[in-house]
Amino acid sequence: IRESFDTSIGTIEDVEAFLHVPVLGVIPREDRKEIAKTIKEVFPESLDPESLELLASISPLFDLKGITAEGYRSLKVNLQFACQDREVKSLAFASAGLGEGKTTTVLNLAITIAQDGRRVLVVDADLRKPTVHSRLGLKREPGLSEILVGNLSWQEVVQTAADLMLGKLGFDQILSAPGADNLNIITCGHLPPNPSEFFNSQRIVDLIAEFEANFDLVIFDCPPILPVADAVLIGPKVDGVVLVYQVGRVGRTPLLRAKTLLENAQAHIVGVVLSNVSAEYSPEYQKHQYYKYSS
């Protein structure tokens, strides 16, 4: 009961002081009206509402000068600095609870890195409530589950720019998107009865090694840490874990517990990303907006 009244951490300094890990990025809250306006400017042909909604959540794909794209470029650079003392080929992104912007962060960071010319693989490791496929307008099956049970190889299930073109995002939208040809996706596949068994097996270790050998960076979109054990099982098997935290949504006690669970499992926590941050928490973004519109 006490936790339900827990005060959330409000500033970057508070987060770093409380968790003792660096804040790698601050992703600003988006103005959906502005994004819709930009989409119509970039793609003047009429788009159906579903395509508009999908594009709005991955605006760095087409709006490289926007404030969201800037936020993800900063995250990319800070990640590189945070990992400069060790080779990082695989990362897991996780959050304490539901709805903290983890999948949005994973997809937009992957897009940003792909725009640099690096081959990126996004793996939907949420075998309970997966969303990567729906967020990109792709089919869910086959995917990771089929690979882990041995029915298919990863080469048979990986989806590429060609699949994105034929999906709900639209042919022209992907064709004109910088870096889309470097973006690779493995969706979750069928939903198994006990996903934790998959992530506690040698097969996932071998599979991660295969991914690392074939891509510049592999990013796992994991389920939230506190409800299920999956992210804690994956964490030690990849090169680093990034926590995604939405200011004001989750209290500091659950956030600290999530970090502690990862540390107890010997996972290497690279840092934390603050998602959906309003200007009141990050006044520097107000300044950024001023310069953006006055330039």
Q: What are the residue ranges of the model-derived segments?
A:
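Short boundary/hinge segments that flank catalytic cores
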Residues: 1-119, 127-145, 155, 163-164, ...
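Conserved acidic residues
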Residues: 89, 184, 216, 239, ...
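Phosphate-binding/switch loop-helix module in NTP-utilizing enzymes
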Residues: 79, 166-228
